[in-house]
């Protein structure tokens, strides 16, 4: 029998919720942190860039948001576990993990030009990093009576995008399997695990690369997107917040495509 649920106003979605955001000091991750805090969340910023962490945390605190930062390489299980423990000790609980840290090779390469070190780098930061964070956070989510994990796949893990390369495609596809299997395992504890699969969005280096394209090349890129445009950064953030919030309380093991229809287009 269905139960009545109160309507959740977006402005109150994360009140008193504690969220860890990996890759949280730059680009999309930083915007996720700011948006969580704007909706009442308490935020722990994990990143490898100490200076960017300091600035992001300062900006959060200046906005009246309870925030801490930790320099974390998600590939290092011991460092991840220690930082997660420090967050739990500081805030008293953890409710949300947003595993936004990831990476790819600077430029796509053909199979023959990919070294074992190249493959290890991409697999480790994406797959091993997500695994390490989930493994460290899940016990704290259980202690909190449940929670949410949002992982990051990509359109590159769901289609044969020519701009991603084999290691990145393999890593982002693996995250989908990790997400589904973990969702099944931890569901009985009230923990939801879902993935977002963004298409191309322009921040930092990618913005510069896109701006340098000839007009005809930019038109070709946009022509592959049924909506005909690139997303605003917040349009990538909002689906993440939805999956992290109680508005998606009956969704787990799912992947949410955020690509303007690019995946549908082939």
Model-identified regions with their sequence ranges:
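Residue(s) in the substrate-gating loop at a strand-loop-helix junction
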Residues: 154
